[in-house]
Amino acid sequence: MIAQLNREYAKSFPKKILSRLYSYFFIEGRPATTKGRWFNPVTFAFLRTASKSKTIAESESPLFITGTGRSGSTILGMVLSAHKDVLFLNEAKAMWYLANPADDIIGSYASKEGRYIMYGKDLVNGCAKDVKGVYSRSLKFTGTRKIVDKYPEMLFRTDYLCEMFAKPRFIFLSRNAADTIASTTNWTVKHRIEASKEDWWGVEGRKWKLLVEQVVPQDEDLSNHVETVRGLTSESDKAAVEWIVSMNHGLKQILKYPDCVLRIRYEDLCENSNRELQRICDFAGLPTDEKMLAYGRQTIKKQNIHHHPKVHPVLAEAIKKVSHRLGYGSTPELINVME
């Protein structure tokens, strides 16, 4: 599906089709593992022009959907995109790379390795102005007033974004370990491009390398096991590492920025989408949109995953600890420990 558009969405929100196509073709870019990368020069040409646009006040208060991949972030973003005031960007990595090349951690556009964790000091000259210029141009073009920027790894860049924007807000989306790990593993196997060595972990494993080198040493559960983690090769183990460090980091951000970070559990979103979507709207300063809420009830469904992933004993122990912190008491029972 182009721009995550399907028949139901197009039928329910015909006026939103242009906004999604605009974001898809001119803001987001086509990263590694995706088709249509030949269009990227057009995207970058537009971004360079849009970045020079005059900024408006609404560009200072984007809402970021963060967490880890395969946790329901895309479907949440698409439901929020149905809100009359929202422009949804689905991992606009072309825009972020153009503003600061260190953003690219998977190797879609940069030959040089990026930064997984970014702080205020990592802002480069003109970066904030360029992003807000693109946001402003996009909001004016689409007649909306709130950017919803889904980019899971921005979880590791809250300091950076709080320095960049006056009033950013963050959704920390969590999903239980077993389902997330199984879903990530399945995606990797399905989408791997052997010829160019591209998969979930970037070009030639760049994302995995940076995760191990830059994030794991700072994690409270895995920092004493860096060499063990470095030697892991199974997809379920690597997915488990990403889940552990992402969830731990997200919990820290809630404590550090209690007024700026809202935790949403994927399971709660599936169980009562009305309540959770209204929480998000209230948090982001968006008015209630009944059509969006109805679409959420129709669209957000729990995906049952029957594959129970096998992980290294060190990771299994860490998963138990993190699951307890997150309130997922029974999740570890669905994790098989490698002998």
Regions found by a protein language model. Give the residues of each.
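PAPS-dependent sulfotransferases, especially Golgi type II membrane carbohydrate sulfotransferases
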Residues: M1-L63, N186, I193-A195, W201, ...
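Short active-site oxyanion
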Residues: L63, T144-I147, R169
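Glycine-rich phosphate-binding P-loop
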Residues: I65-L80
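Short beta-strand segments
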Residues: G67, I147-K150, F172-S174, R263-Y266, ...
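Short catalytic/ligand-binding loop motif for oxyanion handling, primarily in non-cytosolic enzymes
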Residues: T74-G77, M95-L98, L155-T158, A178-S183, ...
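PAPS-dependent sulfation machinery
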Residues: M78-D159, M164, I193-G231, I319-V337
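Conserved phosphate-donor/acceptor-positioning beta-strand/loop module used by diverse small-molecule
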Residues: K150, L161-W187, I280
